[in-house]
Structure formats: structure tokens, C-alpha cells
Amino acid sequence: MAKRIIYNEQARRALERGIDILAESVAVTLGPKGRNVVLEKKFGAPQIINDGVTIAKEIELEDHIENTGVALIRQAASKTNDAAGDGTTTATVLAHAMVKAGLRNVAAGANAITLKKGIDKATEFLVGKIEENSKPISDSTAIAQCGTIAAGNDEEVGEMIANAMDKVGKEGVISLEEGKSMTTELEVTEGMRFDKGYISPYFATDTERMEAVLDEPYILLTDKKIALVQDLVPVLEQIAKTGKPLVIIAEDIEKEALATLVVNRLRGVLNVAAVKAPGFGDRRKAMLEDMAVLTNGQLITEDAGLKLENATLEMLGTGRRITINKETTTIVAEGNEKAVNSRCDQIKKQMEETDSSYDKEKLQERLAKLAGGVAVIKVGAATETEMKDKKLRLEDAINATKAAVEEGIVPGGGTTLAHLAPILKEWADATLSGEELIGANIVEASLTAPLMRIAENAGSNGAVIAENVKSKPFNDGFNAATGEYVDMSSAGIVDPAKVTRSGLQNAASIAGMVLTTECIVADMPEKKESAPAGAPGMGGDFDY
């Protein structure tokens, strides 16, 4: 296919046009008075959402070059989402502001490479300052505040997540399910999560989110490598008759057996997913035994005289639901509390008997995984459209609270970045010079962009509010919901430090890449062939 090649200013301007389109679509959702965006779907009802990264993923432009700009900014949003799970809109607004300010300087003749160095140095300085100003989370009130803000000021959601964290611990697993009623409910059940994902992405049942969700599956647990599909045939035939899904957790599944499972999955013969067992050696076996107890099944191991080819349905475990993504597997089981408790007592005894601190630590990990359980939030709503929006907000809120537990919290509502702007200016003037200083000034000018946008979405003058906030103490900011200046921590308007940091780092990274772009190679738009004229009486000539 023929390519189109664009250089210099023309290339950067084309990228900028794409960036403008995406940033504007996403920025309207920022803040407590942010609006919603409607996504048209080829199949099913339109989706009404308020989540930056989901909107960014939907935007595709006709012009290939402008689409490249969209893809770059989308990357800032999705990387922030991967790292912190929230703050995607802030990252987009920041990246857009940095690109706009940077391109003006490049057009005026500044050296893009030196500007990028200045941007990187300023970002490094700011990351240190965010860390300095973050406060560790001490109680469930702060967790509830974080969840409330991330869910778009929904206090009920914040309280529910704080409640869930109280029950399963800060490291515990919180899972989301679509509920059957109008209200959102919290339930704590037996379950565990481990750090292994599906062996092949073809097992994903939801290709948009790239995860496999299997309801009421059978679970086959074995500590051997499955090399030949013949070993699995007897058990697969039995499961196919029941019509239920199957999850295989094994040491490994080799190519031939894996290919057969994938083909059966794609053809719809059997809903199956395969996962490698976590850990190694004896520890792997112990974890598989824990899973067997949890799911009310047996570990099929030759040590116990059990072979795969002789496996029956009675030997398989069962669960309420299993969710598998590329990195983790979450098992939600139920109705097996007695067996789980006695297994936990057994692990506690082993901990008392061992002298090795390493073994003790690993036993403690197993105990936490098994005893912690899983908090399941059943999302309730009147319509499917509302449920999808609520689910995305809840997901953001869960991620934000986990990020807050990790790295602490800072004043929210764009306040932290706005207060850091004068501090950055002072540092840059003292330590940088020439075009590096201009690079740092680009970052400094962009730091107020999220606050300005939050204020504008609430119908206030963003520039005036940003200047007013800068002159106040570090904790004071603008509450866009009420239109007042308040102490952000007391008002419960807080952001996880990790979210603010990730957003800033990813925005600076993408801005640096756009500014140093000198040439774009993209596909030529395909010429649409005009339709041939119809024969007389066939719609080409009209006879009236």
C-alpha cells in the first residue's frame, strides 16, 4: 500500500489536530460537574459513560495522520489506567496542555530534544514533591473519601468500598458482578486470587477487556504437565455433556493439548480456560491443595495414585465464578467454609512448627489468600446502560483506593499540581538554563490545566480560580461541587498520590515524544470507487 510522508511543522500540526479532538472529548467528563459521553455501539444499546480511558479507546478518525495523534494520547490514558487504575482524564488533559505549549516553542525555533530534557527533569522533580506531600492512609474514612471522589462523588460507593476493605483487608480481593436487583450490594464469600493469568489470550470471553469470566465452572487441578490431549479426553467428554464451563489449573499445558483446547473453545464445543499453577516445587503443590479445599475438589496427582485419564466429575472442584485476565486469576467459591477453616488451622500449626522465617512468610501468604476471602460487589441499576456506567465508576473507585493504600493521598481536584507550579518555577529558575528551562516552564504552565478544566466544567472561570488557588496554603483548593475554596483534606476531596504521579509521568512522556517528532509515515487514504450507474429502470435513470 502507498504511504504518505509528512515532515516538520506539518507533521506536528497533524498530530496536534488529532490530540485536540481526543482531549476535548475526554476533558468534558472531568470533575464533579463533568458531563457524560454517549458511545454508539454497532450492536446493542448506546453506552453512556464518564470514564476517560474508555472514551479514548473508542475514538478512531478517518485521517490516518490525525489518528496517530489520537493513539499517542490514548497511550497516556491507558498507561495511567494500567499503573494506577484511575486518573486517565487528568493524564489526557495534562498531555494535551504540554503538547500545545511545547509545539508553540518548537514552531518558534526551540530545539525539541533540549526541551524534552527540561520536561523530563521537571517531571522528576515533581514526582519527588508529590511523594513528599503524600499522607499515608490511616483509617477507613480516608478510603471512603478516595472511593467517593473516584466514583464521581458517589458517597454510597465510597462507603461500600471502605466496608469491603475492612472485611477482606487492604490487600484483599474485591470483585465486581452484575447484580439482579436495583440496589448495589456487598457480599463476602470464600475465594482467592493468585498471580497467574490465562495461558492463551484465545480463552478470553470478553475481548474488549481481555478477560475470561466463567460462571459456575468445574475446576480441574493437577500438578503435572499436560502434554497430550488424550489425557484430557475422558474428562472433557464428561463435562461437554453437562454444558458447564471448565477451568484447568496445571503445571503447564504443552502446544498440542493447548491447541486442541483453544479450537474447542473457539468452535463453541466447550467453554474452557487454562491457567498455569502459581509457585513452584512443593509450594506449588501446597497452593493447589489449598485451591482443592476451597473449591471442594481433589488435586489430581500421581503421588495420591490419581491419573488424569481416570478423572471423574466428582474429583473436580466447583466455584461460583472465575475471572481470569492476562496476569491474575480470581476464584469465587461458596458454601465451603468449614473445610476452608480447618485448612487454615492446619497452615497456622505449620507456621508454629517451622523455624525458617522464609517458610513462615510463605505460609503467612497462603493463609492470607485462603482466609481473606473475596468481597463481591453486586452492581445494581434500573437499566443496563446505567449498570455499565456504574460498573466502570466502581472499578475506578476500587483501583483508586488500592493506589491510595500503596502510596498515600494528596489534596484532590487538581489542587496538588496547581500548588506545585510555583515551587517548580522557583527550582527551575535556580537550577536550569536556556532551552531546558523553557522545557520546565512548559510543564509548569500545564500543571494548572486539570484544575482549570474542573472549574470550567462547573461553569467558573478556570484561569482566575487557578491563580487564586496558587496563592493559598498547600491543602486549600477549589471545591467545584459547591463553588467554594476549602481545605481539601477536611472536605474529603483527596486523590491517591500514585494516580497523580502516574498521570504526570505518562503525560510528560507522550508530550516529549510528540515534540521530538520530525516525520510521519502513514497509509494513504483508500480511494472509494464510485458505484456504477444502474440500468434503465433499475434506479440509474428515473422514469417518472
From Swiss-Prot:
InterPro entries: Chaperonin_Cpn60_CS (IPR018370), Cpn60/GroEL (IPR001844), Cpn60/GroEL/TCP-1 (IPR002423), GroEL-like_apical_dom_sf (IPR027409), GROEL-like_equatorial_sf (IPR027413), TCP-1-like_intermed_sf (IPR027410). It catalyses: ATP + H2O + a folded polypeptide = ADP + phosphate + an unfolded polypeptide. One of its GO terms (biological process) is protein refolding. GO terms for molecular function: ATP binding; ATP-dependent protein folding chaperone; isomerase activity; unfolded protein binding. Keywords: ATP-binding, Chaperone, Cytoplasm, Isomerase, Nucleotide-binding. GO terms for cellular component: cytoplasm. It is an enzyme of class 5 (isomerase). It is found in: Cytoplasm. Together with its co-chaperonin GroES, plays an essential role in assisting protein folding. The GroEL-GroES system forms a nano-cage that allows encapsulation of the non-native substrate proteins and provides a physical environment optimized to promote and accelerate protein folding. This is Chaperonin GroEL 2. It comes from Prochlorococcus marinus (strain MIT 9515). The lineage of its organism: Bacteria, Bacillati, Cyanobacteriota, Cyanophyceae, Synechococcales.
